[in-house]
Amino acid sequence: MRLLFLFCTLIGLQAANPDIEFAGPAPGKAQSQTQGDVVTLENNVLSASWEVRRGRLQPTTIVDKTSGAKVDQRGAELFRLSTTPVAMGDGSYQVEINLEDARVVVRAGPNGKSMQEIASFPRADFPGDPKLLRVGKMNLKAQAKDHAGEAGPAGEGRILEINPAPAGKTSFGFRGPANRATVSELPWAQGVRSLSARIDRGTDSALSWSPAVALVWEDGKTFLLVGVRDKRGTFNVTTAAGERMTSPKFTPFPAGDLTASAFSVVGEVRRLPLKDGQALEADLTSDRGVKARWRAELRDGSHYFRQTILLAAEGKPYELHGVEFADVRAPGLQQVGSCPGSPLAGAGLFAGVEMPGSANLVTPAGGRSAFSCSLTLSPEQSYDFGTVTGLAPAGQLRRSFLRYIERERARASSPFLHYNCWYDLGFGVDEPRMLDVVQAFDTELVKKRGVPVRSYLVDDGWDQPSKGLWVEHERKFPGGFAATKAKMNPFGAHLGIWISPLGGYGGDKERTAQAQKQGLIPADAKLDLSYPKYKQWFVDRCRQLMREGGVNAFKWDRAGDGVSPHFMALLDVARQLRKDDPAVFINVTVGTWPSPFWLNHVDSTWRMHSADVGWTGKGDDREKWLTFRDGYAHKLFVQAAPLYPLNSAMHHGVVHGRAFQGDKVGKAGNDLKNEVRSYFANGASLQELYLTPSMMTATAWDHVAASAKWAHAHADVLRDAHWVGGDPLKLEPYGYAAWNPRQATLMLRNPDDQPRTIELDADEVFDLPRATRTASPAFDLRSPYADQRLRELKLAAGTKVTVTLQPFEVLVFDTDSGR
């Protein structure tokens, strides 16, 4: 069966919400035209043209009609395919740290080749000389401390060629669990200004505890850590200010030896009317045995156009090792974000491949996006890839890109309020306990307070690996989820399910053995969706859970990473499940990174590379948790991926439980006011309640209900949620704001135990388009909460207003409360 891997949104899944505001004229209806050999898609704000010349299809121009800018695309390739693997060495990487006079520079390269600068810092941040060199596996604070959770699988690796070699030690080997520290601490000679070492991950599978080298200064708080996240060359460079992740390209993009210029157009370029726009389509063929169907689409009301290519082999199977499908000739383009799958932007445009694992190459001529892969094309097996190019009016890049995402994402964003059992029942989850939870939530939230609960998610611990692959535990769920569903039906309740495509954590070896026993994967293989039988089994099992268990949400954990056959199959599984239920919510956790292009396929991703629940800063354990929650959202989403919509971030929700980290937060008391008010104002559509009903008071339920209702009433504007203020990890006041022409919201929080001030200008706070700054400059904000100390706040564009926040105070405002 042909795998049709779509990067476009399924028909009928376009957002029912009003469009995000476009800072320019209304784009209007799409049109297409042919003039000689040139075909064009256009509307009121843009046009894009392609030309058939000597039988070859090539781009010619992009015109921004709002500014009159014309971007010449002649010489750009529609696509480039790689037919040979990209050589990346043996998976070990040379890293260098140089303490220059003005800067501290980090460089890296495969086996010492093609060394590139991957990070730099002011030398003033690292005064004097380091005191220690630490090598091995350590936490992100360069400390020899273990992860609080699962130890993870055992592995081994090495730090080699350490130079200079303190105490004559040039290498360090380790073997141990992935999430446990193994560190060698060595003295650092005064006056030494550089360090180099080769880091070989070997079989180690850690993420945050990846093999690393770290220089540590006298105060113990100043440090610089450089770790290798994976064999593909993802690095984490961490200081006291936070973590940076980067995936530099040490060699040119995938070779791109088969270009679109080598393909001939079969017949003519077809103009196709769509239900809500216009499309162009052409069939292309090459003498290399690969055929392609190119398509360009401009939907009505769009400020962007999309292109897709469907690739297949005409005869014998064809190995594909890379795809480049965004070549935009616009000087000034830059990558926006530090993670894989970051878009390009500049010169009034944004662009990118709709693939979360893509990488960018920026040149003086413009920017290109590509990804390496290992895929086999055949007449029966084809793949579809997509790219986008759009307009970004001055000062409105974030909102312009958000508008594109909201129009094209896999499922329209909307609040998905649900219960998750992890910090309540933990591994003790079973049917009786889940039914008790459903009854309690139905009584306290649904009936008493009028708050709908969309799902009750069963997290890890529900299956019985010794009895089969992802089968319900015979003691915990004796009648299977179908029986549980029948008992939940009177409440109108649905189940959500945690499941791992790669087998999860505890019990993963047994699950793998079960798959091998059933012939789903080879006898010596690990779980991997690229095996057709296992993939089909996984799809069928998820469908069965949806059909028989009434499951309306999946939490895919340990999902895998990198553009591989498994990765491609994973995204296709999501597509297939949406064919059965377009509203199914798919949250992907471990194995993701904050590329906004995930959202073309799934609904939300986790703030990977931080603890699930952690504590930092001041106050009690609940306030420290809030500072951790928002601090790492700021670091891992806002800073690492400025164009990732915060409405699609997984934060680990509201926590008041008795299991695992939930117990520590729960012991801080049941005053949830600050937590729920700050959480529901962040715009997240994945609204998680990790609550133990027996620990809740009537007041606690009231706070949850009031904030959830407020968020649901402001769901439209909260899609625009964006960051305001400083860094919570530095105890700076911060918040979230959202704006559209109809509403605005603002949340502020002080993470310090001392009063702190924050300056607010409506222009900056609400990220206002230029026209709005003059047409509607004033904002009369009021609080929806009667007990809030500051009930009203007036802001104006171009005028700074100083607000003083009391210790740990949370303030929430909107433009329609009390009207």
Report the location of each language-model feature.
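Extracellular glycan-recognition surfaces and repeat-rich motifs
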Residues: 125-170, 249, 253-262, 266-268
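Secretory/extracellular carbohydrate-interaction modules
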Residues: 117-128, 132-135, 139, 164-236
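Sec-dependent signal peptide recognition
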Residues: 1-6
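Active-site-proximal substrate-binding groove within the catalytic cores of carbohydrate-active enzymes
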Residues: 42-44, 55-57, 62, 380, ...
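Aromatic- and carboxylate-enriched substrate-binding clefts and catalytic-loop regions
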Residues: 453-656
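Conserved structural scaffold segments of CAZyme catalytic domains across common CAZy folds
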Residues: 86, 99-102, 259-496, 500-509, ...
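Solvent-exposed strand-to-loop "edge" motifs in beta-rich extracellular domains
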Residues: 196-204, 312-314, 749-751
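Beta-strand-rich N-terminal accessory domains
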Residues: 16-119, 161-163, 169-172, 196-204, ...
